[in-house]
Regions:
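Catalytic core of pol beta-like nucleotidyltransferases
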Residues: 1-30, 38-45, 54-121
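A short, conserved beta-strand element in the Rossmann-like catalytic core
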Residues: 51
């Protein structure tokens, strides 16, 4: 029982740290925690998977360089248009965001978009 409680506490701390990081971003963005910490099946070697939706530079390498994130974070930077395209194509990242994602910040109203775009055909 103590192990489960410890895992819940650790997960809660990671989510709050990610939420704090997201709230401190100096630009309009929506941030979704995905992956093992969102699902609750993380382990000692898990990273913190984040989908970052914002108006970003065109070059993917420049995007990554421009985002200051804590060690252990795996940030997937997308523009709103790119994210919408992934949703419509049922891309695994978008499906993960819809089914298990935890929205940490939502300047682009992604929550509404997720409900609308991910309805069954």
């Amino acid at each position: 029982m103590e192990i489960l409680k410890g895992r819940r506490v650790l997960r809660g701390k990671v989510i709050e740290e990610a939420r704090r990081w997201a709230s401190n971003l100096p630009f309009k963005s929506s941030v979704i925690l995905i992956g093992s910490y969102a699902r609750g099946d993380f382990n000692l070697w898990s990273d913190v998977d984040i989908v970052l939706i914002a108006e970003l530079q065109e070059n993917p390498l420049e995007r990554l360089k421009s985002i200051d994130h804590p060690p252990g974070y795996e940030v997937i930077p997308l523009t709103p248009k790119e994210f919408l395209t992934l949703l419509r194509k049922r891309n695994p990242i978008a499906v993960e965001a819809m089914s298990n994602g935890i929205i940490l910040r939502d300047d682009y109203n992604v929550k509404k978009l997720l409900k609308h775009e991910m309805k069954p055909p």
